[in-house]
């Protein structure tokens, strides 16, 4: 009888999360990317998946689940087991913009997920047609104020629209948002002069800037980007409050056991210290966001509050 009881007790203990977590991870993990293959976010995720797998000793398999502004991928993680084997490549759009722009969003970025760390952040850049008379931010604001009708400004996501709304509020100007489904068509219209100006990520516009196909006006970082030292920041151009980055992070379900979360966070910090990571971020023109889980949580909450103020001021409602 005692042998049977002891065996039963051991079986129950072995089945418990606390016992099972001792060997985490003992099988491959998967990383859900809520965006399509080939995007900058996808390349970012695949790099960190490979490096994280190397540290953990288990493969991290990437699964792209695009659609509905990232909602499909977010829900795939929300409905997965909370065991740490399903990772979410989160981003500023899915974690901070969607809650402000999508009505009846089926997930809560703060209640349904918890961060492991930040991954990377990248600057945005204001661009104009190559033959535009606008050469700097002062020219841009002056032209917007003198224009008899609001200028046409290209964006291709709600996050970029919010970025422009914030700048317009600071500068005291009006604009007409021209939304695109992707950057390619928007770039074509900037080059062709069918848009007065546009906002995009610096990575996507880098080659167009280098070849003179678009004219850079200013970048949104807190300092100039080393590869383009002649492009001033918006901050130094008279708007010290304006610092804006697109960013990505790694999250899991909110009810994932703390020791699993801690092991993932520790592994990711080791990835940040590798030379391969420094080389990747340089190539990708992004910066590391080597945050602790607590630091990333604080950052996300501050970003949500900042963007909420912008959306409220612009009258943007979820739809």
Regions found by a protein language model. Give the residues of each.
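An extracytoplasmic/periplasmic, membrane-proximal ligand-sensing/linker region
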Residues: 26-28, 169-170, 235-236, 258-319
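A ligand-binding cleft/hinge motif common to bilobed small-molecule-binding domains
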Residues: 94-104, 161, 165-170, 197-231, ...
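Short beta-strand->loop
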Residues: 108-118, 154, 174-179, 196-197, ...
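Short coil/turn segments
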Residues: 38, 92-93, 121, 129-134, ...
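Hinge/capping helix and adjacent helix->loop/strand transition within the periplasmic-binding protein
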Residues: 79-85, 100-185, 234, 247-280
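Short, low-complexity disordered leader/linker segments with a strong preference
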Residues: 1-26, 319
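N-terminal (or domain-start) structured segment
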Residues: 20-111, 149-151, 159-160, 172-196, ...
């Amino acid at each position: 009888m005692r042998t049977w009881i002891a065996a039963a007790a051991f079986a129950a203990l072995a089945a418990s999360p606390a016992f099972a977590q001792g060997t985490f991870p003992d099988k491959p993990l998967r990383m859900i990317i809520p965006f399509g293959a080939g995007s900058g976010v996808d390349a970012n995720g695949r790099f960190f998946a490979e490096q994280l797998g190397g540290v953990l000793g288990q493969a991290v398999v990437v699964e792209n689940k695009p659609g509905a502004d990232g909602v499909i991928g977010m829900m795939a993680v929300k409905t997965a087991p909370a065991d740490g084997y399903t990772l979410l490549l989160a981003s500023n759009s899915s974690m901070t913009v969607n809650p402000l722009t999508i009505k009846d969003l089926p997930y809560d970025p703060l209640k349904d997920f918890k961060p492991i760390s930040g991954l990377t952040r990248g600057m945005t850049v204001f661009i104009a047609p190559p033959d535009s008379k606008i050469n700097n931010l002062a020219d841009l604001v002056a032209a917007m104020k003198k224009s008899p009708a609001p200028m046409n400004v290209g964006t291709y996501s709600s996050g970029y629209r919010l970025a422009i709304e914030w700048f317009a509020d600071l500068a005291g100007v009006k604009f007409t948002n021209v939304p695109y489904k992707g950057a390619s068509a928007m770039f074509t219209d900037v080059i062709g002069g069918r848009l007065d100006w546009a906002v995009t990520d610096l990575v996507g516009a880098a080659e167009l800037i280098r070849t003179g196909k678009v004219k850079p006006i200013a970048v949104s970082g807190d300092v100039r980007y080393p590869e383009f030292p002649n492009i001033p920041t918006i901050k130094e151009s008279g708007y010290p409050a304006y610092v804006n980055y697109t960013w990505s992070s790694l999250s899991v379900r909110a009810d994932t056991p703390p020791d699993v979360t801690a092991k993932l966070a520790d592994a990711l910090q080791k990835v940040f210290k590798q030379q391969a990571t420094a080389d990747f971020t340089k190539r990708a023109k992004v910066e590391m966001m080597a945050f602790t889980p607590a630091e990333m949580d604080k950052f996300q909450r501050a970003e949500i509050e900042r963007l909420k103020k912008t959306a409220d001021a612009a009258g943007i409602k979820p739809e």
